[in-house]
Amino acid sequence: MEKYLPACLDSVTDELVSDRLEVIVVNDGSTDGSLDIIRRYEQKRPDLIKVIDKANGHYGSCVNAGLGIATGKYFKILDADDWFDTSALVEFLQKLETCDTDLVITLRVDEIFDKDKKVDEIKHSFCSVFKDHVYRTDEFYIRTHSYEAEFGMNGMAYKTSLLKEMNFRLLEGINYTDTLYCFLPYSRVKDFIVYDLYLYHYRMGREGQSVDTESQKKNLMQIVHMV
């Protein structure tokens, strides 16, 4: 992850956004140079970055560790090989100042790489009927039968208080826990809003990635367990 990490951290430490963020970086027992990179960013911005250095426990343990010390109004996850669009993040943070829904949904761009060369991008939209309007969750169930609607873990920002009040924790020591993150807290959500912002840039094509076909074959029973 070390070669992707600077782009990830740069996207959340830009001067345009850093005064309105709490950045929690979890080092999950990395054996490359990731921790050294994290410490350099921490030294530059000790007011912004909180570092958790722990033994490897897989994805769920990282989310649990970060949520455990989170104090911000909303909780959003960014993987080490992905990044936020700075201009979209600026607008997103401005909107969150007045937003009060339990869940905020933004859009995603899949960045397709062949080795380290970008070869394509796919923008995942959300039907315009949903955008910039507060909906109750029961309205969402009804409307998604008639309109295209797509979102996942990387498009979701839950209220931190909602996650903490339900004592939310992901399973640890197992992959593909994003399914639980999407649906378990959502069962407590009363309302949500969709912002037309392509905030999350999701890197695809990295060898060993969890969505890689070979990785999914290898971890098939973990996927079945999550479902």
What are these regions (language model features)?
Residues K54-A70:
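Glycine-rich, basic loop-to-helix element that forms the pyrophosphate-binding segment
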Residues D10-R20:
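Short, acidic, metal-binding catalytic loop of nucleotide-sugar glycosyltransferases
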Residues S11, N27-D36, A55-H58:
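A conserved acidic beta->alpha catalytic loop
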Residues Y59, A80-I193, M204-K217:
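Donor-binding/catalytic cores of nucleotide-activated saccharide
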